[in-house]
């Protein structure tokens, strides 16, 4: 009874779903996720009541006094149980196709089929979910939130309080990590704090302890992918049929766009002339799966990479040769740095003439800038792939206990939100009369270096040093209607918006100085903290002062909307992405066939960041993304028991990669070349694409397991490839299962 809780010392109030009604905190349009349970409990860990007390400790003590009576019902937990119960989102599976798959499969010289299961992943941001709400005058509410999406927090809090959005101000200074886990999962805390602050008239703060955070909040979607592929004797794909099964949890959250993006990346880097992709989005009694770095892309990409490995094994070919044989053709010379294409092109290009035009993805987007032929050739050379392939084979022939594996996998990742209207950003820039610059933009900083890159953009426009630029916390009262800092879009969108605002102010200053010194604006230059005009040399501060005294506005907003996008998700056709980011990774591993334990010995990565805004930051993202991706596919295992209780909800039971899990030799480099599209300084997004380099580790582990047998049985290693799964796969290879 709530009366027992309210009667405790320092407890101010207790709220239940019956009292507050359906207060929605879901990012989905269906509004199917109430803040507090209403009559039914849909998963173990679902919030039921809210305790308001004078301290965090007292609130937790009081909450332990609560008693809840349940009538247990059998949960739907597995993909098989959801299919049997027809428990799903949408009326049925989503199906996209091209060509005549059935006929092409029937005519194919070889048909291969299989199944791949991959687990979910906990975000494990170092700073947990947290929010602070402070009531203001006239019903206003100021919310400070650890969120990737301040505008969604603003919208949800305003809806919960029954006030317009202008009455709610949301501010985010920075986050201690996000990875997609703070795109929508912070809604509940912000709403709860705002309701408590409105009720008590006092500021209210809330944060999850690590165990609560892991039990309550969403994870990466786990998938099962069934495939049937027809190939010729050279390993070229003639037709492929994918079926994706997505375990979504109890509410929609972001499942539909995540599953869509998995379908959009089912081709990865490969031309699939006849393809069918069927996607089932299944409702289960677990915490709702949500956004996570890659947003479905890694799952879809892993499916086709498993197919390439399976083809190579079935035909007795080198997996890299099969991958290269199925690459999209190079329709035009890639717009890379001087000499790069000449040095690494040619022999590795497909036989089709370059003037045939671009091939298209299964959803109809032309692949016009495909650089993986040259990029992979360069990585083959720099990583000494061919010699190491021979060395690994020789090692495996001589060592019965420790087996090595080697794999090279490519990445082609689409950049843009698939919900087209989210591809926009705003910025606000002030230049003060002393030459200092105040900048605010709609992106959020979570350790990825967005503010550093945006400050560089502003400094380059005005020709000043970074010390002149101050970025203030992301604030819905300064830049409205922001999109989430997600989909690797932070630098692309906000960088362009900031550039537009800064150029407006710079051009005003240039016009004023040109008129004053009787010259043309084009002759006014900004560089190295100086402004040159009509033979005069001014400091930027002097130029700003002159403009101020000339009554020139030194404040401007900037806005950017990504061009060229047109996407119809119902038909599965259009151009959902502005461009593709590319890369490739080589991983070498060793496994102990007696225990299943394994190590990553060496990793070589070559990644396409376009004309990098900050190579040091981008290399950090590439290396960190690889480690996180490798963790998803090796050590990070989520385990639920038969009643739907998450058993891996603490660092003691859930293992993210540690220092000892990193490759012993780690070589990361950036591809030299500009983005052919008109992005900020011709750069490319680098947040999500490197995550998929971790796929090379699973493929290398599979290669090592295959070395334990006679080649007749495909390893069929599932993910995450824990020591237990590796050991079982080894035993199957040796006929001991």
Regions flagged by a language model, labelled:
Residues 9, 17-20, 162-167, 197-204, ...:
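C-terminal catalytic domains of large/alpha subunits in multi-subunit enzymes
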């Amino acid at each position: 009874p709530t009366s027992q809780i309210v009667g405790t010392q320092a407890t101010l109030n207790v709220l239940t779903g019956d009292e507050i009604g359906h207060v929605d905190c879901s990012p989905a349009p269906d509004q199917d996720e109430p803040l507090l349970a209403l009559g039914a409990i849909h998963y173990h860990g679902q919030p039921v009541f809210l305790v308001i007390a004078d301290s965090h400790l007292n609130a937790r003590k009081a909450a332990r006094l609560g008693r809840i009576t349940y009538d247990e019902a059998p949960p739907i937990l597995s993909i098989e149980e959801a299919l049997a119960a027809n428990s799903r989102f949408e009326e049925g599976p989503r199906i996209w196709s091209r060509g005549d798959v059935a006929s092409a499969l029937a005519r194919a010289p070889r048909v291969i089929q299989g199944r791949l299961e991959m687990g979910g992943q906990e975000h494990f941001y170092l700073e947990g979910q947290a929010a602070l709400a402070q009531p203001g005058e006239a019903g206003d509410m100021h919310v400070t939130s650890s969120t990737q999406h301040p505008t969604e927090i603003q919208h949800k809090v305003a809806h919960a309080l029954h006030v317009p959005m202008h009455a709610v101000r949301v501010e985010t200074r920075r986050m201690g990590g996000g990875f997609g886990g703070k795109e929508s999962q912070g809604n509940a805390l912000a709403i709860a704090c705002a309701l408590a602050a409105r009720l008590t008239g006092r500021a209210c703060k809330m944060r999850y302890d690590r165990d609560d955070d892991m039990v309550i909040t969403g994870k990466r979607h786990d998938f099962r992918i069934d495939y049937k592929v027809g190939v010729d004797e050279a390993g070229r794909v003639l037709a492929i049929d994918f079926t994706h099964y997505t375990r979504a949890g109890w509410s929609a959250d972001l499942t539909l766009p995540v599953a869509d993006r998995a379908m959009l990346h089912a081709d990865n880097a490969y031309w699939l002339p006849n393809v069918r992709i069927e996607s089932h989005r299944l409702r289960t009694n677990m915490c709702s799966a949500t956004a996570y770095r890659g947003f479905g892309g890694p799952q879809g990409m892993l499916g086709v990479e498993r197919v390439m490995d399976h083809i190579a094994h079935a035909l007795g070919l080198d997996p890299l040769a099969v991958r290269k044989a199925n690459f999209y053709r190079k329709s035009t010379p890639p717009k890379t740095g001087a000499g790069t294409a000449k040095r690494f092109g040619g022999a590795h290009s497909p036989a089709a003439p370059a003037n045939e035009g671009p091939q298209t993805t299964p959803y109809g987007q032309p692949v016009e800038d495909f650089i993986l032929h040259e990029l992979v050739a360069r990585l083959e050379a720099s990583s000494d792939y061919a010699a190491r392939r021979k060395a690994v084979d020789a090692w495996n022939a001589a060592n019965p206990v420790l087996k090595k594996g080697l794999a090279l996998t490519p990445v082609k990742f689409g950049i843009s939100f698939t919900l087209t209207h989210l591809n926009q950003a705003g910025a606000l820039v002030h230049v003060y009369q002393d030459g200092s610059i105040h900048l605010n933009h709609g992106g959020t900083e979570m350790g990825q270096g967005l503010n550093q890159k945006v400050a560089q953009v502003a400094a380059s426009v005005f020709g000043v040093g970074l010390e002149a630029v101050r970025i203030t916390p992301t604030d819905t009262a300064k830049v409205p209607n922001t999109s989430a800092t997600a989909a690797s879009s932070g630098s692309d969108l906000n960088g362009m918006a900031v550039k537009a605002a800064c150029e407006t102010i710079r051009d005003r200053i240039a016009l004023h100085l040109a008129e004053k010194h009787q010259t043309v604006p084009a002759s006014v230059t900004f560089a190295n903290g100086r402004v040159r005009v009509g033979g005069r040399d001014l400091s930027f501060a002097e130029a700003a002062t002159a403009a101020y005294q000339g009554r020139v506005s030194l404040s401007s907003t900037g806005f950017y909307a990504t061009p060229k996008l047109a996407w119809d998700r119902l038909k599965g056709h259009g151009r959902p992405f502005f461009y593709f980011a590319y890369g490739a990774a080589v991983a070498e591993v060793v496994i102990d066939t007696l225990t299943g334990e394994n190590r990553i010995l060496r990793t070589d990565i070559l990644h396409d960041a376009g004309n990098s805004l900050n190579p040091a930051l981008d290399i950090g993202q590439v290396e960190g993304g690889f480690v996180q991706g490798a963790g998803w596919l090796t050590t990070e295992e989520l385990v639920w028991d038969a009643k739907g209780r998450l058993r891996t909800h603490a660092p003691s039971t859930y293992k993210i990669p540690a220092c000892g899990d990193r490759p012993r030799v780690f070589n990361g480099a950036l591809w030299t070349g500009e983005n052919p599209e008109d992005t900020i300084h011709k750069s490319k997004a680098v947040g999500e694409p490197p995550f998929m380099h971790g796929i090379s580790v699973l493929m290398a582990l599979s290669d090592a397991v295959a070395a334990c047998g006679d080649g007749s049985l495909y390893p069929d290693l599932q993910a995450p490839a824990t020591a237990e799964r590796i050991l079982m796969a080894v035993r199957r290879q040796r006929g001991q299962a």
